[in-house]
Amino acid sequence: MDFNLNDEQELFVAGIRELMASENWEAYFAECDRDSIYPERFVKALAEMGIDSLLIPEEHGGLDAGFVTVAAVWMELGRLGAPTYVLYQLPGGFNTFLREGTQEQIDKIMAFRGTGKQMWNSAITEPGAGSDVGSLKTTYTRKNGKVYLNGSKCFITSSAYTPYIVVMARDGASPDKPVYTEWFVDMSKPGIKVTKLEKLGLRMDSCCEITFDEVELDEKDRFGREGNGFNRVKEEFDHERFLVALTNYGTAMCAFEDAARYANQRVQFGETIGRFQLIQEKFAHMAIKLNAMKNMLLEAAWKADNGTITSGDAAMCKYFCANAAFEVVDSAMQVLGGVGIAGNHRISRFWRDLRVDRVSGGSDEMQILTLGRAVLKQYR
């Protein structure tokens, strides 16, 4: 495997550097984090560069650039301090609709290309069904030629402002043999109530509880095949976990570089703290973790481009990178000392964000469970 960037990938990465140097984005990110605001202006700038077209097939006007290119872009954005967790729907969100959606649904979502606006997200998790997706209670019921949605969802990302969500629900007419189907829901419909939740981190992307009270849908609002909900979201979970891991790496790399610059400038006892062996030890361990993360992610991206990536690969990336990145940021914060915890340094935001990522997108424990099963399956 050769992970040297080709000319097209180098061009994208150079464009990212140019964009990030064009203004003081950090001040904007700090404001958005403080006020829990989606950084639409920044995402629009990325969309105008074509970031939201990276994985769209050429026949649909996309770049079909592949996952190694996505990885290179994500890593560089993260290294430069960008909150890439707000971008999870950009590389793959359009493709999901091209595969599963009706033409009407596709047209509605594709209209968001190049805008930077939030467009849709999945609504799966419920108060009584987190990792145990099979315990979903939200139902759809057919009556008089219509479909009615009832139930509640929680911890749904981006849902404060997205105009559409794809809701997984079970067939109310089949209680003994659960049938899970997804529905494309316009958030302006009567009977929908959205309650925004506060979070420790990842504050630039909303998190909400949503209730559905006799929300009326049509058969044409079904998303994908009847009863195919589980199969569809399994692929989405793998995709999301890979992107979360990329975000973790980029954030950790940014914290590492911030701390390294500080260690080479901060003077105590007559010399820079970077000359002290205890500080050097921290950087040695941080560098080892960062190198391991990077190689794991690039291998996974290569597998994705070659059609060989598995759920075990995605779980391995998510678990290892979420934990290793948090350890790197925590060590970097220790190097920064009071500057990292009492000032307005961005590392405090990174620390909060990475702690959340060990729960969101699939908890550490679920990644270990998925990975353990995948490993043993190879030897049956």
Swiss-Prot record:
Pfam family, one: Acyl-CoA_dh_1
Alphabetical list of InterPro entries matching this protein: Acyl-CoA_DH_CS (IPR006089), Acyl-CoA_Oxase/DH_mid-dom (IPR006091), Acyl-CoA_Oxase/DH_mid-dom_sf (IPR046373), AcylCo_DH-like_C (IPR036250), AcylCo_DH/oxidase_C (IPR009075), AcylCoA_DH/ox_N (IPR013786), AcylCoA_DH/ox_N_sf (IPR037069), AcylCoA_DH/oxidase_NM_dom_sf (IPR009100)
GO BP of this protein: carnitine metabolic process
Gene Ontology MF terms: acyl-CoA dehydrogenase activity; flavin adenine dinucleotide binding
EC number from the UniProt entry: 1.3.8.13
Gene that specifies this protein: caiA
Taxonomic classification: Bacteria, Pseudomonadati, Pseudomonadota, Gammaproteobacteria, Enterobacterales
Pathway annotation: Amine and polyamine metabolism; carnitine metabolism
Keyword Transport carried by entry: no
Role description: Catalyzes the reduction of crotonobetainyl-CoA to gamma-butyrobetainyl-CoA.
Listed CDD domains: ACAD
Oligomeric form and interacting partners: Homotetramer.
Protein's name according to its UniProt entry: Crotonobetainyl-CoA reductase
Record GO cellular component, one term: cytoplasm
Reactions listed under catalytic activity: 4-(trimethylamino)butanoyl-CoA + oxidized [electron-transfer flavoprotein] + H(+) = crotonobetainyl-CoA + reduced [electron-transfer flavoprotein]
The entry's keywords: Cytoplasm, FAD, Flavoprotein, Oxidoreductase
Cofactor(s) the protein needs: FAD
Family: Belongs to the acyl-CoA dehydrogenase family.
Subcellular compartments: Cytoplasm
Main location group: cytoplasm
Domain of life: Bacteria
